[in-house]
């Protein structure tokens, strides 16, 4: 791959660009011989590490990390009928131990409610045990029958963060839902990914939930990608799995629950929204390397330049930055290309003239040039990286704003969707009208109670029947 210096497909051909960038930037290898299972390259896995490190830091404020088994006994998995109805066609079953048939089939977790909640029933006895707030980051398996796509639609989700909480009352669980939404906002702000939050219609909520709040991002082709969900589970699962507590008056009460999930789709959105025709563009907070130093070595001062580059690397690393020094025997231009496609936010070029001037050329991933003072390298570099983050966030915000619109007619909705936009319409919340919107516009009714800084959510007449309606998000989805 080191000698592969051909141009990427243009990003306007998003599907081709996406598939190529995963390979060329060393994110994922798609050649594993099982459909829907992919291999992380070390470079891509480092990006994943920094993304999930930030997510862990947010969750650790009031959750405890744990780990539950991958295998779920059939009798536990089948307890919650409504929940199972949503997953039964996607389950992988383990039926043998070696050559011996198992007495009880074991499901590979598609999600972990039915693994975790029998244990909650053992852990919860008194109101003093509540609330419980745990999370795990694990792999999950779903027999995906649609076309698979790396990081977006998988048979093995390698990086599924699922949070599960238990509360004394429905209202306390609702407060937890809002807390998870706030956490999600902070997480995606760190990734410079604008999000749209909405309440999924009842027919599209998580199986067994009272309601589902979903988080969507608008991809470069105008399709929406669901990159997070928060579910208020009410007491459905606690009733099924007998999760009860004794209140202060000595009475037995059913608990109320929430669950919350983010998968590696967050990295798909990160790659897709920020990248350009040259490759990845990574926010400094999650870049494998935040800075690459390219020494320009000429003639007799070769050793002087390398020594100065090494000192610069040490100075920046001592300031907490992730830095790589590229001393390979390649032309500078080949090195520039190598690191551009991999999205390193800042390149520092250091040659003989720079040693004389006490400065180094600084080039951002998007091509802006300035200089840093070698005597003040850490402070100057950190300032540039802050500016890079702000610029990436602003550009992504403009993309989202330009791909959102409000329309009041079905013709207007068709035009918006065909232009690669996501539309806000008014809908009365009647299922028949919802089905009509989806069928006529060949789209998905994403949700009501729209929360976005990029568009105003108002009330108005339903786009189908004219009855009073609420702002509703409509788009084409992955």
Curated annotation (Swiss-Prot):
UniProt-listed InterPro entries: aa-tRNA-synt_IIb, aa-tRNA-synth_II, aa-tRNA-synth_II/BPL/LPL, Anticodon-bd, Anticodon-bd_dom_sf, Pro-tRNA-ligase_IIa, Pro-tRNA-ligase_IIa_arc-type, Pro-tRNA_ligase_II_C
Enzyme Commission code(s) on record: 6.1.1.15
Function text: Catalyzes the attachment of proline to tRNA(Pro) in a two-step reaction: proline is first activated by ATP to form Pro-AMP and then transferred to the acceptor end of tRNA(Pro).
Claim: Signal is one of the keywords in the record: no
Subunit annotation: Homodimer.
The keyword Nucleotide-binding is assigned to this record: yes
Domains (record comment): Consists of three domains: the N-terminal catalytic domain, the anticodon-binding domain and the C-terminal extension.
Gene Ontology molecular function: ATP binding; proline-tRNA ligase activity
Name of the gene encoding the protein in the UniProt record: proS
A Gene Ontology term for the protein's cellular component: cytoplasm
Similarity field: Belongs to the class-II aminoacyl-tRNA synthetase family. ProS type 3 subfamily.
A single GO BP: prolyl-tRNA aminoacylation
Reaction(s) catalysed by this chain's protein: tRNA(Pro) + L-proline + ATP = L-prolyl-tRNA(Pro) + AMP + diphosphate
Record's protein name: Proline--tRNA ligase
Subcellular location: Cytoplasm
Alphabetically ordered keywords of this record: Aminoacyl-tRNA synthetase, ATP-binding, Cytoplasm, Ligase, Nucleotide-binding, Protein biosynthesis
Database matches in Gene3D superfamilies: Anticodon-binding domain, Bira Bifunctional Protein, Domain 2, C-terminal domain of ProRS
Superkingdom field: Archaea
């Amino acid at each position: 791959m080191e000698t592969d210096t051909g141009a990427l497909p243009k990003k306007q051909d998003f599907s081709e660009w996406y598939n190529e960038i995963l390979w060329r930037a060393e994110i994922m290898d798609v050649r594993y011989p099982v459909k829907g299972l992919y291999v992380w390259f070390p470079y891509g896995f480092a990006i994943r590490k920094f993304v999930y490190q930030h997510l862990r830091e947010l969750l650790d404020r009031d959750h405890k990390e744990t780990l539950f088994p991958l295998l779920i006994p059939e009798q536990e998995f089948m307890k919650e009928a409504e929940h199972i109805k949503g997953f039964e066609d996607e389950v992988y079953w383990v039926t043998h131990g070696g050559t011996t048939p198992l007495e009880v089939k074991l499901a590979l977790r598609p999600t972990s409610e039915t693994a975790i909640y029998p244990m909650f029933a053992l852990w919860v006895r008194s109101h003093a045990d509540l609330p419980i707030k745990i999370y795990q980051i694990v792999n999950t398996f779903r027999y995906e029958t649609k076309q698979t796509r790396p990081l977006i639609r998988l048979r093995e989700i390698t990086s599924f963060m699922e949070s599960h909480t238990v509360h004394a009352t429905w209202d306390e669980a609702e407060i937890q839902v809002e807390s998870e939404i706030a956490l999600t906002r902070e997480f995606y702000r760190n990734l410079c990914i604008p999000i749209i939050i909405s309440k999924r219609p009842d027919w599209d909520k998580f199986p067994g939930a009272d309601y589902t709040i979903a988080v969507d991002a608008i991809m470069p082709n105008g399709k929406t990608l669901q990159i997070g969900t928060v579910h208020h589970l009410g007491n459905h699962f606690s009733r099924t799995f007998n999760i009860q507590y004794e209140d202060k008056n000595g009475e037995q009460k059913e608990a109320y629950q929430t669950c919350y999930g983010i998968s590696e789709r967050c990295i798909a959105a990160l790659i897709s929204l920020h990248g350009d025709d040259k490759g990845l563009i990574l926010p400094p907070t999650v870049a494998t390397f935040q800075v690459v130093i390219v020494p320009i070595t000429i003639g007799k001062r070769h050793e002087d330049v390398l020594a100065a580059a090494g000192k610069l690397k040490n100075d920046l690393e001592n300031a907490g930055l992730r830095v790589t020094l590229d001393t390979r025997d390649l032309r500078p231009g080949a090195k520039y290309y190598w690191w551009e496609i991999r999205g390193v936010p800042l390149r520092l070029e250091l040659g003989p003239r720079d040693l004389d001037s006490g400065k180094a050329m600084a080039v951002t991933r998007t091509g802006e040039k300035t200089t840093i003072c070698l005597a003040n390298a850490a402070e100057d570099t950190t300032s540039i990286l802050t500016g890079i983050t702000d610029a990436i966030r602003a550009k992504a915000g403009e993309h989202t704003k330009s791909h959102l619109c409000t329309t009041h007619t079905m013709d207007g909705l068709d035009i918006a969707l065909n232009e690669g936009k996501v539309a806000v319409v008014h809908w009365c919340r009647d299922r028949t009208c919802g089905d009509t919107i989806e069928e006529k516009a060949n789209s998905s009714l994403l949700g009501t109670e729209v929360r976005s800084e990029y568009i105003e959510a108002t009330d108005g007449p339903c786009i189908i029947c004219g009855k009073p309606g609420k702002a509703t998000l409509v788009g084409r989805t992955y």
